[in-house]
Structure formats: structure tokens, C-alpha cells
Amino acid sequence: MNPLSYPRRQIFGVLAFALASVCAVAQGSPQVSPAVQELRDIGAKDPLRILQMLPDSPTFARIQTRRYDFREAGRPMEYELYVPSRYNNSRPTPLIVALHCLGAVAHDMIRYEHLTELAEERGYIVVAPMGYNNHGWYGSRGPGHEPVGGRGSLATKDDPENLGELSELDVMNVLGAVRKEFNIDPTRTYLMGHSMGGGGTWYLGIKHPELWAAIAPAAPAIFSSPDDLVKIKNMPVIVVQGDNDQFVKAETTRLWIEKMKSLGMKYVYVEVPGGDHMTVSCRSPENMTKIFDFFDQSRRH
């Protein structure tokens, strides 16, 4: 099966099982506008529908769908790329690598609300890799096709045995391709991701600290230990989490926050009262702005 055409809705039909060890429903949401509450209700029942409801933007016209020869996988692989209109090859440009959530694709991630608008306004290139398919976990749950750390692998008979390895390698290949083609500022290369992509952000941020000026995991589905944070104790981190997340418990994310605090790390924690799993990232211009503000202030030395 083509990893670009995997039936996405089937993925979220069993998402609760995939995130079994971090699954819970928090109670007591604060008062919000009817429009916001409607989005949260939809996201709780059908997360992929929220992605189908992302508002259009004039900046989407500049999004490019690219394809490269993924030799290690023996197939072509797509990724999405946004280059701001003021890009000048004579000047180093900041780059954001954006990792999509479980069941989504790169096309969805790069269209998160206000992402490309802010990239245009502030002069960032944004690239969204596929991660081989929509459930590879970017290597964060092991190199194979049966993820470690809980039930619900979401693996299919068509998945390669080294799915996790290929998912991680795809991200690194795409990063390399963008750095080769464009004048990327090595002191301003950032990593962000949502849900599965948030877990991938923790994982790849910790594994390759030499690459990133800062990272931004949102509602991160991560199955490793916060003790790993000692490897990036000098890296700035901003974390976004809803306290009413039905798939990733806020309590789990807070363990990582407490560890960052104990290590004396530079971090910002944005916990959204009543926030669900999806809208805190894909439908929150406010949170996206906070991420860009944090990136603007972060350089790798």
C-alpha cells in the first residue's frame, strides 16, 4: 500500500488504543465562546474532521508539494514546503520542521491555522515531512513496525519491518534536502510537532540536540522517560497542552515540565484551560504566535 494514501480515518478510529498509556478525560472546562466549544466538541469525537475544517489562507498558494527519491525505502516520498515571499538566498533564513499528528499527513500539518501566515510575516521557511506514512511515529516508539510502550501499534501487514527507522530517516532526509537547497540559518533551525509529532519532537530533539535552536512539542504523545531531558538541558523548549485532552493526559505532560524545572531549563509551558487534543495546536492562532515568539528569541550557540 502507498504510504501516502493510507486510509486516515481508520487510524483515528483506534487512536485511543494507540495512546492507551496516556489516555484520559479531564473534567471541568471553563466558559468559552460557542464557536470554540463547538470545535472542541468536534475534535473530541472526530479529530480528523477538525483537520478538514482548517480555514483557508492566501499563504496556502505558496505551499509546494515536493517529492524526493527515498532510496532507503525504495520509493518516492512527498513533503510540504513553505518559502516566504521575501526569501533571499544571500541571507541565512530560519527554518521550522513541523511533524504531523497520528492519522494526518504533511499536507495537514503545514496548513495548521496561522502557521504559514506567521512564517510569511516573520520570514521563516517551514517544511513538513511525511515521516514515511501517517503512523510511523518518527522513530519515537522504536525502529520497527510494532511500536513499544503500549497497545495499539496501528501497524498493518503492508508496513515495512523497519517502519520506525524509515519514519525517522525521512525527517532527516527532508531536513538535509532543504538545507542543501536553501540558505538555512544553522543557529535558527527549529522543530515542532503535534500529538504523535509532539512525541517525535521530543525524540528527535533529544537525539539530535546539535540541530535545533529550540523545540515545540504540542499535546505530545511520548512514551519515554522525562529523565532523557538531561541530554537537552541547555535547549529552550515551549510546550502546549490542553488540560481537557482526551488522548494525552495533562498529568503526563506536567511530569516533563517538572523535570525541565528541576534541570533549570529555559522553557515556557502553555496549558490551555478546557483545551482538547486538537484545537490547542491546529486551531489556535494564539498558541501558534506564542511558539513563533519563543522561536524568535531562541538561537543555538
Regions found by a protein language model. Name each.
Residues P94, Y124, A213, M235-P236:
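Alpha/beta-hydrolase fold active-site loops
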Residues P34, E72-M77, R91, L95-N183:
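Serine-hydrolase catalytic machinery in alpha/beta-hydrolase-like enzymes
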Residues R111, G176-N183, T187-K233:
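Primarily recognizes the serine-hydrolase "nucleophile elbow" in alpha/beta-hydrolase
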